[in-house]
């Protein structure tokens, strides 16, 4: 699933390609993804200028004077910018054709994504989101404060989008490894000092992933079609039975909260 680094990568790519461009027409090649795509987009967005492109958690926000297009890539979605005359590919379900002769196309094979619209930029899906991990609201002490009396494991805790957004499974595994924290520990049992270390590790891992263009395991590609290169920097995720580069111990894989967890039993205590 595309997480914060992947959406940030797409946001930056789109900003350089489609900002200040006018929409020729919005085309719904399918009526729905996870939810129904608003039919009025085909008329509402015609001749509208793309003013800014933002990100909130895993949501891409494309802003116009008349409102905000809210896009979520679901489990397998991707966005590309191509020449408008490029043949439509299978699973490309939504398209913004621009007056400069290019098109922004959303591909979503599993159809767990979403294309929504808000006149004022607000939406119930955005209202419950936690803090952004790369902003000052994610400060030393924040995770410690939120974790008091929490019985859930630390990995599930930092993946909770109501606490902090965008720390997906890959980045949770990598951050906990860098911080030397066992993913099985209860969130409420970890000291403030260790949480402060983890906070910095989350920031560092996400920043590195963004600089590498995200992580491609299966479906994710950047807007230019290139894969994300953070895959080459993974220390534990996908490294079952390989040697830990720090201690030469063996990386372990187990299922935790219905997700694969990778960690070094020796390094992470």
Curated annotation (Swiss-Prot):
The active site is at residues 2-3, 58, 259. Binds 1 zinc ion per subunit. Coiled coil: none annotated. GO terms for molecular function: 8-oxo-7,8-dihydroguanine DNA N-glycosylase activity; class I DNA-(apurinic or apyrimidinic site) endonuclease activity; damaged DNA binding; zinc ion binding. CDD domains: EcFpg-like_N (cd08966). A zinc finger (FPG-type) spans 235-269. Keywords: DNA damage, DNA repair, DNA-binding, Glycosidase, Hydrolase, Lyase, Metal-binding, Multifunctional enzyme, Zinc, Zinc-finger. It holds the Pfam family H2TH. GO terms for biological process: base-excision repair. It catalyses: Hydrolysis of DNA containing ring-opened 7-methylguanine residues, releasing 2,6-diamino-4-hydroxy-5-(N-methyl)formamidopyrimidine; 2'-deoxyribonucleotide-(2'-deoxyribose 5'-phosphate)-2'-deoxyribonucleotide-DNA = a 3'-end 2'-deoxyribonucleotide-(2,3-dehydro-2,3-deoxyribose 5'-phosphate)-DNA + a 5'-end 5'-phospho-2'-deoxyribonucleoside-DNA + H(+). InterPro entries: DNA_glyclase/AP_lyase_DNA-bd, DNA_glyclase_Znf_dom_DNA_BS, Formamido-pyr_DNA_Glyclase, FPG_cat, MutM-like_N-ter, Ribosomal_uS13-like_H2TH, Znf_DNA_glyclase/AP_lyase, Znf_FPG/IleRS. DNA binds at residues 91, 110, 150. Its cofactor is Zn(2+). It comes from the Bacteria. Its EC number is 3.2.2.23, 4.2.99.18. HAMAP family: Fapy_DNA_glycosyl (MF_00103). Monomer. Involved in base excision repair of DNA damaged by oxidation or by mutagenic agents. Acts as a DNA glycosylase that recognizes and removes damaged bases. Has a preference for oxidized purines, such as 7,8-dihydro-8-oxoguanine (8-oxoG). Has AP (apurinic/apyrimidinic) lyase activity and introduces nicks in the DNA strand. Cleaves the DNA backbone by beta-delta elimination to generate a single-strand break at the site of the removed base with both 3'- and 5'-phosphates. Belongs to the FPG family. NCBIfam families: fpg (TIGR00577), PRK01103.1 (NF002211). This is Formamidopyrimidine-DNA glycosylase. It comes from Vesicomyosocius okutanii subsp. Calyptogena okutanii (strain HA). The lineage of its organism: Bacteria, Pseudomonadati, Pseudomonadota, Gammaproteobacteria, Candidatus Pseudothioglobaceae.
């Amino acid at each position: 699933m595309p997480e914060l680094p992947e959406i940030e990568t797409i946001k930056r790519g789109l900003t350089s390609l489609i900002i200040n461009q006018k929409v020729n027409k919005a085309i719904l090649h399918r009526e729905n993804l996870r939810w129904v795509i608003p039919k009025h987009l085909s008329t509402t967005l015609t001749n509208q200028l793309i003013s800014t492109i933002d990100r909130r958690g895993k949501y891409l926000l494309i802003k116009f004077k008349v409102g905000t297009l809210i896009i979520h890539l679901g489990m397998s979605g991707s966005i590309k910018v191509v020449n408008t005359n490029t043949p439509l590919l299978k699973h490309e379900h939504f398209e913004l054709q621009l007056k400069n002769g290019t098109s922004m196309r959303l591909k979503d094979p599993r159809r767990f994504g979403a294309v929504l619209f808000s006149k004022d930029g607000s939406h119930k899906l955005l209202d419950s989101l936690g803090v952004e991990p790369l902003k000052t609201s994610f400060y030393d002490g924040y995770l410690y404060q939120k974790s008091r009396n929490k019985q859930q494991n630390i990995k599930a805790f930092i993946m909770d989008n109501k606490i902090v957004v965008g720390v997906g499974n890959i980045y949770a595994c990598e951050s906990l490894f860098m911080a030397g924290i066992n993913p099985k520990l209860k969130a409420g049992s970890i000291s403030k000092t260790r949480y402060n270390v983890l906070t910095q590790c989350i920031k560092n891992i996400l920043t590195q992933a963004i600089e590498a263009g995200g992580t491609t395991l299966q479906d994710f590609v950047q807007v230019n079609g290139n894969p994300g290169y953070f895959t080459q920097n993974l220390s534990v995720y996908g490294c079952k039975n390989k040697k830990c580069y720090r201690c030469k111990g063996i990386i372990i894989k187990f299922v935790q909260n219905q997700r694969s967890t990778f960690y070094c039993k020796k390094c992470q205590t």
